[in-house]
């Protein structure tokens, strides 16, 4: 009866461990499979005319895809483009996944904003059409910016726009080391947007009273070590979020504080318009590149020591702990049963314990990641950025941990059950 009870206990432990490894929590404890697909609301997309003002949506009325497919013919007007939207805009709430293809970004506060980056490893210029949102919080159903990636951030509120600027090691979100980067914006070469269908919301527009506000004009420059994101509203939104200087980088387009090691929120004055100098307009590619405008002044600043969520590290730690606990329990039970059995059964138990240990170790390995980077993050013609360095984070390891753990737990449990059956 004792051995039968042991077998039943081992089966129960296996089932419980498997369920724990696969179950989507949706509470920030681990990557949630629900964040890897859109919500399938099947709400219609409004009409769209190229180079005309785009439709806006209340957040609750978003279509599955803002742009979808077949908006224009590929290569229309001699320009490349016309490809379908690769991600989705109706994203799961209050959860996250490093395989998410959510293309709805947010800029709400110093602790709650998103940046655009490649969905798969590649330069910003190569991957801007299919970029996805990476956020500092798990509220938006996106991928997470790993803790330690952002090494300085400066959030500024004005009456006409809100922006966040800073430095970091963005090899952790699949931007190659040394990539000077480029611009994400809602237009692109064919007005489908970079990324196609990418949209931005904010709760920081004073006129929206804290409700999500659809941002029609925004700009986000990204490189391997520098970022800037601005969301504009009002009559001068297009001019204050200009998108024609895509190789000029952050410091030329959005002069601001990029100091590393500082995380602050400030009120700010309105900056001068990009490319406008005493009534004349600079065009990218002109023989002489003018200097960047001075950074506007700011006031009423408050700071914190850093920003982070702890979710990727917590998820990895919890998953490893779960495997170690269930494996230890199975090995202990098998050893107890073995000591009361014959020498032959005892030998089998020792083999089983070894197999369990081996399988657990193989289920917790990490994937590949990019190296660290330092240097300027601006495009040609811009001033040199603050240097930054640091070990890159593996953005795919956390996303695949649940499936890896399920396999390793399953193998360990099967071996333990086999040993118990042999003893019977």
UniProtKB/Swiss-Prot annotation:
It is a single-pass membrane protein. Residues 37-54 have a biased composition (Polar residues). It is found in: Cell membrane; Secreted. Keywords: Cell membrane, Membrane, Secreted, Signal, Transmembrane, Transmembrane helix, Virulence. Residues 362-382 have a biased composition (Gly residues). Residues 22-403 are extracellular. Residues 1-21 form the signal peptide. Residues 295-304, 327-347, 383-398 have a biased composition (Low complexity). Induction: Induced during infection of maize. Plays a role in the formation of the appressorium, a specialized infection structure with the purpose of penetrating the host surface, and is required for proper remodeling of the appressorium wall and vesicle secretion. This is Appressorium protein ROW1. The gene is ROW1.
